[in-house]
């Protein structure tokens, strides 16, 4: 659909968890991937660190896009493709998942008529096309409509909202070859690079929904309790972390990740506020104000594995059902894990289920405008 010299692309601007961005129906975007990415970049105002000419919020957490379509997979209602854009470059990365944006998928589908309300609670299965991961998402639809007001609170988003419950069905090896892509619970590496002396540290490379490299903050000369501002201003630390990321990614089978936004890098320390573990996560070059959904699931999983870098630091509940509170700079993120003994596996435990609570909200409905010279819209 055109408006003057621009093409209007229908979308809903939505907050999903602690992220936000425009959501589109796949049919309203170009079918050609390269052209689609150019349209998304134009709509978001990238590349420009302020994203002044688009919808982006000048931060990786507000430079995200959701693309939704009806699924053809039996038993699955929706296909969801997540796209991570960056304010200051022209990359559109659809490799990793985003559990925060995932929270807004079913509300989007209900708001746009792709799905119908089932009752006071509505549950649909969603397939993430990024990694072929499936999950069941339940939203509050009391009164026959999506409810956004409620009493659920998540750290990193202001106020309270109606709950969105996400049950992940199979998250191990979302991008990597498996849960432990190096085949070990713990690896010892010596990191070299320009601008710092070589250093040796232990890492846990793990992917239970998001590829992470976890290591003790003390191994890079930090406490793990620094503020986000201090972390982002620490040029020496960021140089070391990036050198580690590029080096360890080869061991993880990810190859050259210099232009990728994974793996994420997570510094850990003993909990301070009654949780299981304290974290500071780089995504990968900016310190996260909180922690990503699937990163929290992956951190929680590492906490239950014997011999991981979390072993001896994390404070864990007993029993097969574990509620793991992952502390982050603005609060905590609780992940409900179901585990079973697995002596044949590295780490001795198998995580059979991961569930978590998020919230979402429709912020605006309308059309994103892109130059007609770039794309004239879907064929009639």
Where are these regions (language model features)?
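A glycine-rich beta-to-alpha transition motif near the start of alpha/beta enzyme domains, typified by
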Residues: 1-380
